[in-house]
């Protein structure tokens, strides 16, 4: 939901961050850089399981488009610096991550923490645990509604996110496949890549079109 609602923020801030980090890494002679992208860079209708060479072959998912374009730009920036200046900037595309200190903000969170929080709030409502609902909203208000607001206001805002005492609505058709990875395992993989993988290992020698993906 956040990708679609805050489209300008997503593309503007991500492009700014990437340009600053990659550009300053080059300016200061950083020997190796790991750029983390996103699986949303691949086309909406890409054949499953997705192949890396599906990138830029057809339209992106519209709701993720600004974020995806920013991530593609970062990947191509790393690739272009490598080809022009001989840098060693590696781009990897993690799947959906979850783990400690995750973001449970219903307006901005990713799919798994959003599902967990929705189910938690739905369970509290179903069991009549109003204190549990209020504690949750005091910790993370939704659209400015916290646990001190009226019951009517709270129920109304939760209903907008598909949360009620008798059901929890998870958005989507139910057809897409999702893959999740524990964040600490991604951290281990990132360390391994930095220690054992270089840009030259990401393509076959003799390739005329070199891709950093």
Where are these regions (language model features)?
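Alpha-helical substrate-binding/gating segment
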Residues: 83, 97, 113-170, 178-212
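NAD(P)H-binding glycine-rich loop region in Rossmannoid oxidoreductase-like domains
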Residues: 1-14
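Conserved Rossmann-fold NAD(P)-dependent oxidoreductase catalytic core, especially the SDR/UDP-sugar
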Residues: 16-65, 90, 103
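Short-chain dehydrogenase/reductase
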Residues: 11, 15, 54, 59, ...
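Active-site pre-Tyr helix/loop in NAD(P)-dependent dehydrogenases
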Residues: 38-39, 53-55, 75, 94-101, ...
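Active-site Tyr-X1-5-Lys
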Residues: 20-23, 62-95, 111-133
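Conserved active-site region of classical short-chain dehydrogenase/reductase
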Residues: 15, 19-23, 76, 184-187, ...
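Short catalytic/ligand-binding loop motif for oxyanion handling, primarily in non-cytosolic enzymes
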Residues: 1-2, 42-44, 99-100
């Amino acid at each position: 939901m956040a990708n679609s609602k805050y489209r300008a923020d997503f593309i503007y801030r991500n492009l700014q961050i990437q340009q600053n980090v990659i550009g300053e890494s080059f300016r200061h002679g950083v020997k190796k850089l790991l750029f983390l992208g996103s699986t949303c860079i691949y086309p909406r209708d890409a054949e499953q399981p997705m192949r890396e060479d599906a990138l830029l072959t057809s339209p992106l998912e519209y709701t993720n488009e600004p974020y995806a374009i920013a991530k593609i730009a970062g990947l191509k920036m790393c690739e272009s610096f490598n080809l022009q200046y001989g840098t060693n900037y590696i781009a990897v595309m993690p799947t959906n991550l979850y783990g400690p200190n995750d973001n449970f903000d219903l307006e901005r969170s990713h799919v798994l923490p959003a599902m967990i929080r929705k189910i938690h709030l739905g369970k509290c409502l179903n069991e009549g645990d109003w204190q549990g609902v209020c504690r949750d909203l005091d910790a993370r208000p939704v659209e400015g509604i916290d646990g001190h607001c009226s019951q009517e206001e709270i129920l109304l805002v939760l209903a907008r996110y598909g949360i009620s005492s008798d059901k929890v609505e998870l958005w989507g058709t139910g057809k897409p496949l999702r893959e999740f990875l524990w964040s600490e395992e991604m951290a281990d993989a990132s360390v391994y890549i930095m220690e054992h993988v270089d840009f030259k290992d990401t393509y076959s020698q003799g390739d005329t079109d070199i891709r950093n993906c």
